[in-house]
């Protein structure tokens, strides 16, 4: 049968959500469910240590709300208001919603953006100890009420930050995590023809306890963020910044020898950070070969796709296919015709299934 998996967006609600609407009306109970400030004093303190997730498309971590005359914490986009887990009502409401959905038959919950849910001044507001306390409480309650339900964590962080989200055998947290580091290292190995970083990543995974179970994938609805293990890169005498620049330019198709056709996402000229977008088929060379009418390039692209999927499926864990990968779907550039999403290159691989 089919087990239904639903997203639980732990970090924020839309600004059109009932809570946000009531907060805009000035209802204090609902204003307290977000982090709202009358002046820039505290927001400016947060900004000193809190990185920006989308510096190009959504700069800053706060948004002015005219209705409330408050600055609202918005880590991701201005229309996504961060929840205030310092207020226990937020956790209680969240677990109530999860249990309601579990009672309706949902068997897997994908907890979204979980590393960001706890905020403290003077920190980067990511991966803080309180985050793990909240996930642990969530797991404990699910095990008591609906022990068959699976908790899947979306933790897109540096490799060293991932294992702790499984918790320990005595105090478990997530049942499963996305294999982000494995995915990134697969694509890096394809571009550089250097498997040393990938081998290191496999060694790390095989050294983890048996309770660490990953969802393995090549592509998803989001970008590829080049979060490689910088310490290991340095040990291998690889410059992390130059390596990252090479990778995102390779998959953008900048180099004449590159077979990929992708686009950059959120390029930051200061840090030289950028992410890559595109479907598996386009990043592996099928689109380029087809556009140029080169059958040999297409065949090589198909072989790359098969090799990448074979490598992914050989890893211990649960395999996930992104919609369109099963038919070799290429990039869809029509998103650029829509002014609402034209600046978001992730829609390059978020097309209709066809």
Give the location of each predicted region.
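Active-site and adjacent substrate-binding regions of carbohydrate-active enzymes
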Residues: 1-354
């Amino acid at each position: 049968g089919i087990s239904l998996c639903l997203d639980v967006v732990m970090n924020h609600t839309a600004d059109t959500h009932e809570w946000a609407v009531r907060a805009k009306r000035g209802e204090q109970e609902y204003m307290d469910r977000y982090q709202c400030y009358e002046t820039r004093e505290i927001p400016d303190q947060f900004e000193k240590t809190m990185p920006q997730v989308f510096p190009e498309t959504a700069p800053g971590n706060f948004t002015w709300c005219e209705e409330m005359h408050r600055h609202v914490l918005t880590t991701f986009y201005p229309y996504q208001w961060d929840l205030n887990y310092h207020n226990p009502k937020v956790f209680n409401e969240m677990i109530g919603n999860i249990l309601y959905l579990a009672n309706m038959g949902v068997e897997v919950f994908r907890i979204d953006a979980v590393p960001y849910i706890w905020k403290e001044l003077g920190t980067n507001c990511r991966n803080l100890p309180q985050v793990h306390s909240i996930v642990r409480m969530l797991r404990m309650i699910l095990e008591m009420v609906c022990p068959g339900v699976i908790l899947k964590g979306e933790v897109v962080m540096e490799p060293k930050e991932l294992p702790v989200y499984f918790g320990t055998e005595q105090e478990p947290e997530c049942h499963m995590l996305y294999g982000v580091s494995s995915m990134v290292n697969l694509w890096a190995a394809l571009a550089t023809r250097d498997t040393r970083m990938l081998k290191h990543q496999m060694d790390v995974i095989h050294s983890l306890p048996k309770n660490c179970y990953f969802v393995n994938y090549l592509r998803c609805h989001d970008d590829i963020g080049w979060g490689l293990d910088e310490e290991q890169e340095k040990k291998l005498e690889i410059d992390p910044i130059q390596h990252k620049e090479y990778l995102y330019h390779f998959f953008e198709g900048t180099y004449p020898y590159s077979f990929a056709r992708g686009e950059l996402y959120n390029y930051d000229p200061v840090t030289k950070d950028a992410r890559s977008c595109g479907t598996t088929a386009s990043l592996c060379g099928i689109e380029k070969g087809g556009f140029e009418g080169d059958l040999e390039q297409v065949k090589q692209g198909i072989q790359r796709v098969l090799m990448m999927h074979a490598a992914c499926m050989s890893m211990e864990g649960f395999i996930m296919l992104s919609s369109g990968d099963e038919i070799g779907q290429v990039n869809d550039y029509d998103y650029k015709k829509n002014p609402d999403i034209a600046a978001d290159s992730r829609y390059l691989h978020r097309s209709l299934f066809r």
